[in-house]
């Protein structure tokens, strides 16, 4: 009896159930790709790219999101080889590679010769989760940002993005697109902030949301208010909202060198479960 050869293929709407079953092996860690699959139903016009699948013995064993972000999921050495081959054939279309540290490292090893040098390589990013009420009292000052406060929030979002990624989101005419993204987050109730006298002292967002997890991202504290131990209470407020809205787990990943942020998340009750890595272009 002949066995099906391992192969890479571009997935489509008919593969949604198989991808969902695969990701359910670790849905919290892979919340980003899970969210994208659920949101787009693997329709090419909504993906803005592709999702690749790798079959062994006729069974889907790994996937790789290949759009604005290149994100391997549950990959093996053979599937990494296949993903790298397709990525090299297409040329770089993504702004980053992200995922479990060992998977990203293996993929980047194969791509660096053609795609490098990267603008930034972040090889060790603790992936942390909170699956219980926060350990610190939530700040009453943090709330969802209103639609009429987008102008107030926007400068803080630009500052956070620039500080975190080393480049302004407004570069190369990107201001209108980034502003639209901020407005969309506000309209969906995913942007939180502590605002006083029309100034943002703290902000955070909830990014990918699935039935399994909600991901905390874009956390920022006004530099004038850092080092005062206030961030934990504000992060706790966002986490409380996420858990109250039905997410069983809140996740995040943070740069290893950002010791103050890691301590803040630990105070809130987050624990590390694995390591991520990110390659930025």
What are the language-model segments listed below?
Residues 57-58, 65-70, 133, 165-166, ...:
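Acetyl-CoA-dependent GNAT
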Residues 98-104, 223, 252-262, 279-281:
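Conserved beta-strand-loop-alpha-helix junction that forms the acyl-donor binding cleft
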